[in-house]
Amino acid sequence: MLTVPGLCWLCRMPLALSHWGICSVCARAVRQRVSLCPQCGLPAAHPSLPCGRCLQKPPPWQRLVSVSDYTPPLSLLVHQLKFTRRSEIAAALARLLLQEVLMARRSTGLQLPDRIVSVPLWSRRHWRRGFNQSDLLCQPLAHWLGCAWDSQTITRVRATATQHHLSARLRKRNLKNAFRLELPVQGLHMVIVDDVVTTGSTVAEIAQLLLRNGAATVQVWCLCRTL
């Protein structure tokens, strides 16, 4: 997807604020329109009550906030973020996520975090890519919300197989004991930020780690929640 300075990247109309990248009309258009469970982020009958899945077997986090399903046009921008390290794309996507967070706070009293954490990459993968796309989202979010962020709160201590083609059961096994907590989180309200949540195995492993070490609550914020 070509990004043109001064024009909305999606509709190509002039931007009132050129550094935003996405106009307000398109920002509203990319938002998820179906009713979603506030806990797992999957389709549900009521957007303010946990779904039947979460009542029977809740995930280890309390809330999940997402912008959209992993579909165009948002998926195209997420792909560019993941492989090009363009700060203007990161800021624009972080702003979309911020808008979802603030709307959830107004409508449901969403708890704002004391600290946000990114999903870490294995050190060798981080070195090859040169950056962590989750870090690029965390930086502006922490600044706008006035909360703490440290990219070293959680580290990935071993390499894991690529998750894309694994079943949910194999994903869970693949990630077991893959992360280590480096900073104390006792009593803190924590948020895990990622670009895409598919089965939730990665963020579930991190959420369990945070809760075992005394975090008061854990939320997941992501750009795309695969439905």
Swiss-Prot record:
Superkingdom as given in the UniProt entry: Bacteria
Q: Which Gene3D superfamilies match?
A: 3.40.50.2020
Q: Which cysteines are joined by disulfide bonds?
A: none
A single Pfam family it belongs to is Pribosyltran
Output the InterPro entries linked to this UniProt entry. Answer: ComF/GntX_DNA_util-trans (IPR051910), Competence_ComF (IPR005222), PRibTrfase_dom (IPR000836), PRTase-like (IPR029057)
Q: What does this protein do?
A: Could be involved in gluconate metabolism.
By sequence similarity, the record places it as follows: Belongs to the ComF/GntX family.
PANTHER family, alphabetized: DNA UTILIZATION PROTEIN YHGH (PTHR47505:SF1)
Q: What is this protein called?
A: DNA utilization protein YhgH
Q: Which gene encodes it?
A: gntX
